[in-house]
């Protein structure tokens, strides 16, 4: 008979989607952002295959943790349920690997319609590094505004801006830390973004063809030219 510790260690790790949905839940109730996130993931408002990312879960966690909200904020690895260290040998991201992982996440329904935030960006990086051995640092998108295209050729997930349903004033304390509310805070153009799969990105390097200046010296443009274009778009050059 195994000990309680061994049973805890053998507990199945949550999937990427669950980890993303657990990020930054608020103190109570379900916000309009969470409802919209569910409707984006499951057309028709169905809850099929998804436990609601309701803030009630965070309220329960707070009660069990001595009333401390976001108690796992101090240990982000524990919050997202990934290993502290990679379970497989590390390897760099490649075009083929990016395409394969993009389709893998698409087939598992892990990213489609999920609100983007800097925190969720980090969770995705950490998940792929610890579960697949893919060294982080490759996941970057064009500056915007509008659709943000992946700058790594082969990654088939772009960020698409959506219009958010306004939250009633008397609910302003509900789930203010949910990515539906905070996504625009992270974004320099104050747009709320969601991940969207686009298989055509495997054939068309949109980020490079439309915004070569964002690639700096790799663009093949004279330094003065690409820096001037960045400044004209309000993008820092240093």
Curated annotation (Swiss-Prot):
It is found in: Host cell membrane. GO terms for cellular component: host cell plasma membrane; membrane. It holds the Pfam family F-protein. The keyword Membrane applies. Residues 70-77 are annotated as: Acidic. It is a lipid-anchor. Residues 16-38 have a biased composition (Basic and acidic residues). Residues 1-85 are annotated as: Disordered. A motif (PxxP) lies at residues 86-89. It comes from the Viruses. Residues 122-138 are annotated as: Mediates dimerization. InterPro entries: HIV-1_Nef_core_sf (IPR027481), HIV_Nef (IPR001558). Keywords: AIDS, Host cell membrane, Host membrane, Host-virus interaction, Lipoprotein, Membrane, Myristate, Viral immunoevasion, Virulence. A lipid is attached at residue 2 (N-myristoyl glycine). GO terms for molecular function: GTP binding. Factor of infectivity and pathogenicity, required for optimal virus replication. Alters numerous pathways of T-lymphocyte function and down-regulates immunity surface molecules in order to evade host defense and increase viral infectivity. Alters the functionality of other immunity cells, like dendritic cells, monocytes/macrophages and NK cells. One of the earliest and most abundantly expressed viral proteins. Belongs to the lentivirus primate group Nef protein family. Homodimer. Interacts with host CD247/TCRZ; this interaction induces down-regulation of cell surface TCR/CD3 complexes. The N-terminal domain is composed of the N-myristoyl glycine and of a cluster of positively charged amino acids. It is required for inner plasma membrane targeting of Nef and virion incorporation, and thereby for infectivity. This isolate is from a Gambian case of 'neuro-AIDS'. This is Protein Nef.
């Amino acid at each position: 008979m195994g000990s309680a510790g061994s049973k805890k260690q053998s507990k199945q790790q949550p999937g990427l989607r669950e980890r993303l949905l657990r990020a930054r839940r608020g103190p109570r109730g379900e916000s309009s952002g969470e409802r919209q996130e569910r409707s984006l993931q499951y057309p028709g408002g169905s809850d099929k295959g998804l436990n609601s990312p309701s803030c009630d879960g965070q309220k329960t966690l707070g009660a069990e943790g001595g009333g401390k909200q976001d108690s796992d904020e101090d240990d982000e690895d524990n919050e997202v349920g990934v290993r502290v260290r990679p379970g497989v040998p590390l390897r760099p991201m490649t075009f083929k690997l990016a395409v394969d992982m993009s389709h893998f996440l698409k087939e598992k329904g892990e990213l489609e319609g999920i609100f983007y935030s800097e925190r969720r960006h980090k969770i995705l990086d950490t998940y792929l590094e610890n579960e697949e051995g893919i060294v982080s640092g490759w996941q970057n998108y064009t500056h915007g505004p509008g659709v943000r295209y992946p700058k790594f050729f082969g990654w088939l997930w772009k960020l698409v801006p959506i219009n958010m349903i306004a939250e009633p004033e008397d609910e302003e304390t509900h789930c203010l830390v949910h990515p539906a509310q905070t996504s625009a805070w992270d974004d320099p153009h104050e747009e709320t973004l969601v991940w969207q799969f686009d298989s055509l990105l495997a054939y068309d390097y949109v980020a490079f063809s439309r915004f070569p200046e964002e690639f700096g010296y790799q663009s093949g443009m004279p330094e003065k030219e690409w820096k001037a274009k960045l400044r004209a778009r309000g993008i820092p050059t240093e």
